[in-house]
Design a protein with these regions (language model features):
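Active-site acidic carboxylates
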Residues: 8-100, 121, 147, 151, ...
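Active-site beta-loop-alpha junctions enriched in small/polar residues
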Residues: 60, 106, 155-157
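Catalytic cysteine-centered active loop of the rhodanese-like fold, especially the PTP/DSP P-loop
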Residues: 63, 101, 118-143
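Active-site catalytic loop in hydrolytic enzyme cores
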Residues: 101-111
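Short amphipathic alpha-helix with an adjacent loop that forms part of the alpha/beta core around
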Residues: 111-119
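Short beta-strands and strand-loop turn motifs
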Residues: 126, 151-155
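Short gly/pro/ser/thr-enriched loop/turn and capping motifs at secondary-structure boundaries
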Residues: 132, 157-160
């Protein structure tokens, strides 16, 4: 917190945990890299809660009609169907008392409404897949909040492959998103 005149202004960090769901970790689209980041994610989330950060979980969310969607035609692997075990956030990192956002697309399109009225001074992004949903949300957030520092912790992210993970980190750095842990 900082003093401005006689008023105290609270500075807040938002930790956004992107799509760390069973289907992306051990399920239909899981990878060994996604499994490997779970201890780092748990530590990061625990530290954020202890620091009083705003913790927000996103969930990739599809319906039974997934195969008929544009994404389903390009990636014909049913995953994260709402209500299934694969759709759930991985138990060891989930915090049911934190905000959970369901999003039907790679990027959440209502960040301005969710974060705009808060005294957020820093945003940190972690999760999966670095090269799809993490980068999509990082770029949306950067466009909406160009004066807020946005960081991606590479040690708490996993991509579809190590190569596309690294490419996404490089692309985000090019857009003035700070990458740590790489």
């Amino acid at each position: 917190a900082a003093k401005t005149g006689s008023a105290e202004v609270a500075f807040m960090k938002a930790l956004i945990v992107i799509d760390v769901q069973n289907d992306f970790v051990t399920g239909a689209l899981g990878t060994k890299q996604a499994v490997a980041i779970l201890p780092n994610l748990k530590s990061k989330i625990d530290a954020g809660i202890a620091a009083g950060d705003e913790i927000i979980f996103t969930r990739d969310t599809h319906g039974a009609d997934y195969a008929d969607t544009n994404e389903g035609r390009h990636l014909p692997v049913p995953h994260c169907i709402k209500g299934t075990e694969g759709w759930q956030v991985v138990r060891e990192i989930d915090r049911p008392d934190c905000v959970h956002i369901d999003k039907p697309t790679f990027g959440y399109t209502d960040w301005a409404a969710l974060l705009g009225g808060r005294e957020i001074t820093e945003i940190e992004i972690v999760g999966v897949c670095t090269d799809i949903c993490v980068i999509s949300n990082a770029l949306i957030l950067k466009a909406l909040f160009p004066e807020i520092d946005i960081t991606v912790d590479a040690d708490c992210c996993a991509g579809v492959s190590p190569e596309t993970h690294r490419a996404a980190l490089t692309a985000m750095q090019s857009c003035q998103i700070r990458v740590v842990g790489a």
